[in-house]
Regions:
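Surface-exposed amphipathic alpha-helical tracts and adjacent flexible/coil segments at the periphery
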Residues: 1-10, 15-21, 26-33, 51-52, ...
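Alpha-helix capping/helix-boundary segments
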Residues: 99-100
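Glycine-rich, positively charged N-terminal anion/phosphate-binding segment
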Residues: 37-54
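Conserved phosphotransfer cores of two-component systems
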Residues: 108
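Gly/Gly-Pro- and Ser/Thr-rich, intrinsically disordered tail segments characteristic of DNA damage-repair
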Residues: 76, 113-124
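Short beta-strand elements of ligand-binding domains
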Residues: 64-65, 95, 115-117
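Alpha-helix capping and helix-loop boundary segments enriched in small/acidic/polar residues
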Residues: 39, 117-121, 140, 224
Length: 407
């Protein structure tokens, strides 16, 4: 059985630490440039340095995305950025552009180069091409089936790794190379500034009636013809193992700590259970399915893994997320009184019942006994986002425990 890596996203230093604690084998992050997530918090040089050190202390790898499709004017900055990354010693760079790949090979040859799914890697000849250029890993295009990935594995060297997205948002465009955002808003998805027009509501115009906008109804709110369901392969871990995939990748470099912790913890347990015993994996399936629905998500699909998706892979009647839990904060130490420090994310009150989410899979229901602000004043509720508070939940807590509330 191949050693499987669980690769988890992180939008910030805080989320990286959560990903590490909640079960990631590797974390992928973006810096302040060239990482295709302009809206994400992303990592400063200092945050990246601290994050890589933290991950390495816990035996976890860090990969940095440099997957921009570069123009001529980007190239001097790319070279300078890669020179900076060389000092930080990430475990790999994730790259889509052949020119950027070549520059990385020249500037920091000692850092592994992984080829991004953005490079449209749909066949074993492409994998062999990248292998010949020095790639250690190639990310499979989202449009590939399990059977196609298995065939690729049969035609490539054992030391060339396959990375595949197994959970998260799906892009309407071929491997995410979308032009809709650029066309409608002038913001280029391939430069990290996607405005997600695939989630908008659309009307149609008949050619001879250019000023008449006609709605297309799925329900009273209109239709969302490009709006994909989210990918979820938690029920198909055996097939992913059998396909010869080396890295199971979670989408979500814009997601919250609660989302990352929930998905990482669930897939960590599913992978470990299956490695111990296929029967144990099947026995715990209700737990996986329950947990994976405890963070904000859309309806689920298996994408292209079992052939071309049917119309059931799309959400036509709305563009909303499903939400089971609200994220309240992360435990970040204690004060002199033994109260636990958190930075509040959503309102909660004294007397309210909430839940502590622990990395080992345990969820503990507790009642908020006390809330104190930084000046030592008692509060009945915590209404201000990102306010630093000290709380008593009547139960011992640990660093990086996550607090959430069932809705």
């Amino acid at each position: 059985m191949r050693k499987i890596e669980l690769l988890v996203p992180a939008s910030s230093l805080e989320v990286l630490k959560i990903a590490v604690i909640f079960g990631a084998d590797a974390v992928y992050i973006g810096g302040e440039a060239f990482g295709l997530r302009a809206k994400a918090k992303n990592f400063s040089h200092e945050d990246m340095k601290e994050g890589i050190a933290f991950a390495h202390e816990h035996g976890v790898k860090v990969y940095v995305t440099v997957n921009i499709l570069a123009h001529n004017y980007d190239l001097p900055g790319v070279r300078e950025y890669l020179t900076e990354l060389k000092e930080l010693k990430p475990d790999a760079l994730i790259i889509a552009d052949p020119g950027v790949f070549q520059i990385a090979k020249e500037v920091c040859p000692e850092i592994e180069r992984h080829v991004s799914t953005q490079a449209n890697n749909t066949n074993y000849a492409t994998y062999l091409f990248w292998y010949g250029l020095g790639a250690k890993r190639v990310g499979s295009a989202r449009e590939l089936s399990i059977a196609e990935i298995k065939e690729i594995r049969e035609h490539i060297p054992d030391d060339l790794e396959i990375e595949t997205f197994i959970h998260g948002a799906m892009c309407i465009s071929y491997s995410g190379r979308c032009l809709l955002s650029n066309y409608f808003t002038g913001r280029d998805a391939n430069q990290g500034a996607c405005t997600h027009p695939c989630r908008w509501k659309y009307s149609i115009v008949e050619e001879t009636r250019p000023n008449e906008y006609m709605p297309v109804y799925e329900n009273e709110r209109g239709t969302y013809i490009f709006n994909s369901k989210d990918l979820c392969m938690i029920e198909h871990i055996p097939d992913l193992f059998d396909a010869g995939i080396d890295s199971f990748k979670i989408e979500g470099r814009m997601k919250t700590a609660l989302y990352v912790a929930t998905v990482a913890r669930t897939y960590r347990k599913a992978i470990d259970d299956y490695k111990k015993s296929p029967e144990l994996y099947q026995q715990n399936m209700p737990w996986y399915l329950d947990q994976i629905s405890n963070c904000t998500y859309r309806q689920f699909t298996t994408g292209f893994f079992y052939g071309k998706p049917s119309d059931e892979a799309q959400i036509y009647d709305n563009n909303t997320y499903l939400k089971e839990y609200t994220y309240l904060g992360i435990v970040g130490g204690t004060n002199e009184e033994g109260l636990y420090r958190i930075e509040q994310r959503n309102k909660f009150s004294v007397g309210e019942q909430i839940e502590v989410m622990k990395p080992d899979g345990e969820n503990i229901e507790v009642t908020v006994k006390r809330i104190v602000d930084e000046e030592g004043n008692d509060m009945e509720s915590a209404p201000h986002p990102k306010q630093v508070l000290y709380i008593d939940l009547g139960h011992p807590l640990e660093m990086y425990d996550i607090l959430r509330r069932k809705e």
